[in-house]
């Protein structure tokens, strides 16, 4: 199978990290164009040094480039607000779109959970970095015991959050909360993001709480460990910070949760994660970049394989 050419819209932290991954790691994707809006951005400068065609004129500049004709897949690493127009123009040109913003125009994709179910969609959404780290865990619990409520807290180093991430905090929480339900399988979902200003910057850490039906704890633990191994297959720095914790919530002391109707009794599962980045662009503390761009590249590679299958049948 020949390599599929890709373009990346957004020359910030996420876009630049993704570009480096495609060039260093992918056997089926090839960089075609890096697109930005700031001619002085480090991402565009780095792309040019690495021999990638660039434009600082945004989506309009991309459409005007002769290299765009050979591009088959476009990644959008801009912002939720910019994605709608970007998607419309890219799809109108007959290309596939992978959305790394919280815009969520297309279906949510979490590779180890539903990565094979959306390969024919013209636009797929990668949820958020926090979603990519935590929703696999919610799904792992849910496949053993029905999750009534899933809550995740994603803590990332402030230095790893560029202007696009900062502008999309509300969209981050809304999109992640919805994906906890739609992909993770929880009846209700809640997401919280923390930008940690600590110096030196701390590694990405995520906490997952699931309130679920009472079930075999060992089966839940094993399901979580199996899921962690699946994520590690494309994000080696993804790991459990400590042992999975369980707590029985009895009828004598039921939980009152604003997001849920009535009282809750059952099993509380607590999972603590950390994500160490591969340091392709920002240092290893930026695991939030690594899990997002790794998931996007894995999804693009699966889409490329599906496109190849379609072309040969």
Curated annotation (Swiss-Prot):
A GO term for molecular function: NAD binding
Active site: 129
InterPro entries tied to this protein: Acetaldehyde_dehydrogenase (IPR003361), Acetylaldehyde_DH_C (IPR015426), NAD(P)-bd_dom_sf (IPR036291), Semialdehyde_DH_NAD-bd (IPR000534)
SUPFAM superfamilies from the UniProt entry: Glyceraldehyde-3-phosphate dehydrogenase-like, C-terminal domain (SSF55347), NAD(P)-binding Rossmann-fold domains (SSF51735)
The reaction(s) this protein catalyses: acetaldehyde + NAD(+) + CoA = acetyl-CoA + NADH + H(+)
Binding site for NAD(+): 11-14, 160-168, 288
GO biological process: catabolic process
The protein's Enzyme Commission number: 1.2.1.10
Pfam families associated with the record: AcetDehyd-dimer, Semialdhyde_dh
Main enzyme class: oxidoreductase
Keywords: Aromatic hydrocarbons catabolism, NAD, Oxidoreductase, Plasmid
Record-stated family: Belongs to the acetaldehyde dehydrogenase family.
This protein's name: Acetaldehyde dehydrogenase 3
Organism: Rhizorhabdus wittichii (strain DSM 6014 / CCUG 31198 / JCM 15750 / NBRC 105917 / EY 4224 / RW1) (Sphingomonas wittichii)
Lineage of origin: Bacteria, Pseudomonadati, Pseudomonadota, Alphaproteobacteria, Sphingomonadales
């Amino acid at each position: 199978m020949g390599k599929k050419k890709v373009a990346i819209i957004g020359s910030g932290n996420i876009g630049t990290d993704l570009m480096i991954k495609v060039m260093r790691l992918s056997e089926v994707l090839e960089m075609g164009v890096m697109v930005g809006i700031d001619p002085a951005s480090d991402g565009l400068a780095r792309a040019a040094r690495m021999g990638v065609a660039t434009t600082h004129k945004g989506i309009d500049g991309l459409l005007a480039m002769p290299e765009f004709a050979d591009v088959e897949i476009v990644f959008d690493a801009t912002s939720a607000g910019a994605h709608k127009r970007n998607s419309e123009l890219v799809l109108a040109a007959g290309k596939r779109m992978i959305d790394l913003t919280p815009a969520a125009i297309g279906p949510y994709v979490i590779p180890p959970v539903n990565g094979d179910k959306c390969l024919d969609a013209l636009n797929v959404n990668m949820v958020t970095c926090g979603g990519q780290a935590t929703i696999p865990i919610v799904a792992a619990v849910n496949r053993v015991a029905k999750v009534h409520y899933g809550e995740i807290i994603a803590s990332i180093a402030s230095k790893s959050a560029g202007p696009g991430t900062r502008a999309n905090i509300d969209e981050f929480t809304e999109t992640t909360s919805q994906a906890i339900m739609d992909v993770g399988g929880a009846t209700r979902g809640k997401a919280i993001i923390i930008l940690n200003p600590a110096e030196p910057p701390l590694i990405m850490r995520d906490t997952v709480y699931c309130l679920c039906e009472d079930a075999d704890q060992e089966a839940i633990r094993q399901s979580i460990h199996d899921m962690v191994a699946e994520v590690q297959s494309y994000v080696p720095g993804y790991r459990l910070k400590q042992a999975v914790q369980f707590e029985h919530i009895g009828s004598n002391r039921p939980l009152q949760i604003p997001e849920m109707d009535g009282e809750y009794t059952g099993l509380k599962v607590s999972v603590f994660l950390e994500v160490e980045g591969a340091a392709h662009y920002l240092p290893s503390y930026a695991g939030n970049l690594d899990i997002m761009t790794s998931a996007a590249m894995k999804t693009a590679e699966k889409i490329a394989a599906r496109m190849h299958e379609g072309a040969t049948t």
